[in-house]
Design a protein with these regions (language model features):
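Short beta-strand element of the alpha/beta-hydrolase
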Residues: 185-189, 195-206
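N-terminal cap/lid segment of alpha/beta-hydrolase-fold proteins
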Residues: 36, 148-192
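Alpha/beta-hydrolase fold nucleophile elbow
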Residues: 277-287
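Short beta-strand/loop motif that positions the catalytic acidic residue
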Residues: 360-361, 367-369
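C-terminal catalytic histidine-bearing segment of alpha/beta-hydrolase fold enzymes
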Residues: 375, 382-421
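Cap/lid segment of the alpha/beta-hydrolase catalytic domain
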Residues: 194, 207-268, 319-328
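Hydrolase active-site cap/lid region
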Residues: 291, 295-340, 396
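Short, hydrophobic beta-strand segments
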Residues: 82, 92-99
Length: 421
């Protein structure tokens, strides 16, 4: 087939190095993340499998590799029989022409048994998912924000001695948001400082509430507001929105995320109202649903100086419906429940789709992506990211799914925000 090729390379390596001290009578398989599984330009994507022969005699392996689009459509199938010398190894490499920018699924099987499945990326910054915002998108959100501003926040701030620590004092915050809904959060303030930057942390979908860091020196750098949106986390006890995602989906005016997005803005209102906060240095961060909230905050409110979303949710529902099992089932189920075409549901969702907010973002953005994410597939992350025109950068973690390596990502995020302090 034109554009396809494979390469077999046999390499002798010390058995103790290969097996990490394990001596099992079996052929072992190990995937090598060539180029961290992200490819650009003229370079063909390459996938490799290392075969380790633990036997004392020659062994054969019937290896197959299937390359598919992230939608599941098969593109290429490779088959190769390999002979591996006793206590030796062989590296099998397959390369292929990626037909277009995007993410591709790779499935390795040996003797018809699946042994490894993973995703690779090709030119993710060139993925095209055009705006599908309705004509009244901007006016809808302008009106919604005006309605939020008609609600007096009635901030209540009470010191929480139990959660306070060496470097920061924590306060329980209660306030009124869109349509009079009460929402809650934790406000952590650096001790001994009269002026400081602040970061708003938006939480993931259904996340269990967590307290701010108060006992490591790094946390003294800025204040932090961890906000719980309506019906979730600190507000779970008062939840009247069911499973949140499908609540009120029949109309844009009643959909759950209309109010939740306004809770995102109300959190900014609170931080901005604090006298000691440096108003030019308010940041936003969060993962999954919190990543979506971070991007919404940056799009709808120019008081945010920079944003750091990771594995963002709520993006590119037209493609998300095909890529995400849970989301696809939820959207199709809602269409069936309402007895309407799926296109009608997607029209409603377009008002809440992150990619339709992306062009409104003016502040710098850094995004973290889990290449193996099946909850918020990386395609959907880049659908919105690629429409952002402000300064931006991204980090792809090749072996991670919906959870990034915490220490690594936190360091990236910290260094990013430090540039604006």
């Amino acid at each position: 087939m034109k554009g396809l090729k494979y390469l077999i390379v046999v390499v002798s390596i010390c058995a103790s190095t290969l097996l990490h001290g394990q001596m099992k009578d079996t052929i072992a398989y190990r995937v090598e993340p060539v180029n961290n599984w992200v490819f650009f330009g003229d370079e063909n994507p390459v996938v490799e499998m290392v075969l380790v022969n633990n036997f004392m005699n020659m062994q054969k392996s019937n290896l197959s590799c299937v390359i598919s689009k992230d939608t599941g459509e098969p593109l290429y199938t490779f088959k190769q029989q390999s002979s591996v010398a006793p206590k030796d190894s062989a590296t099998v490499s397959f390369s292929f022409n990626a037909p277009q920018p995007g993410f591709y699924s790779v499935v390795f099987s040996a003797d018809d048994k699946q042994i490894k499945k993973f995703n690779i990326a090709y030119e993710p910054e060139k993925i095209v998912s055009p705006y599908d915002a309705q004509k009244d998108f901007n006016s809808f959100w302008d009106l919604t924000i005006l309605q939020l501003h008609e609600i007096k926040p009635e901030y209540k701030v009470v010191k929480n001695k139990a959660l306070s620590g060496k470097y920061r004092t924590v306060y329980d915050v209660t306030m009124k948001s869109f349509e009079g809904e009460t929402i809650r959060g934790y406000w952590a303030v650096p001790k001994g400082k009269k002026n400081y930057p602040a970061v708003i942390t938006y939480m993931g979908y259904g996340a269990t509430p967590w307290a701010p860091d108060v006992n490591t020196p790094e946390c003294a750098k800025m204040a932090e507001f961890i906000i719980s949106v309506r019906g979730q986390a600190l507000n779970q006890e008062y939840n009247k929105y069911g499973d949140w995602f499908t609540y009120g989906m029949s109309k844009k005016e009643t959909y759950y995320y209309r109010g939740a997005y306004m809770d995102v803005i109300r959190a900014i209102d609170f931080v901005y109202s604090r006298e000691a906060v440096d108003k030019t240095k308010i940041f936003a961060q969060g993962g999954s649903q919190g990543g979506a909230f971070t991007l919404v905050a940056c799009a709808l409110d120019d008081r945010i100086a920079a944003g750091a979303p990771h594995v963002p949710f709520m993006s590119d529902f037209v493609d998300y419906e095909k890529l995400g099992k849970w989301i696809g089932a939820a959207l199709r189920g809602e269409a069936k429940k309402q007895d309407v075409e799926l296109s009608k549901i997607l029209e409603t969702m377009s008002y809440f789709d992150i990619k339709n907010f992306a062009g409104k973002i003016k502040c710098p953005i850094v995004m973290g992506v889990g290449l193996q994410d099946i909850v918020c597939p990386p395609h959907t992350n880049f659908s919105g990211y690629n429409l952002i025109t402000s300064p931006k950068e991204y980090y792809i973690y090749p072996k991670n799914g919906h959870s990034l390596p915490i220490k690594e990502w936190f360091k990236v995020r910290e260094n990013f925000f430090d540039k604006f302090l």
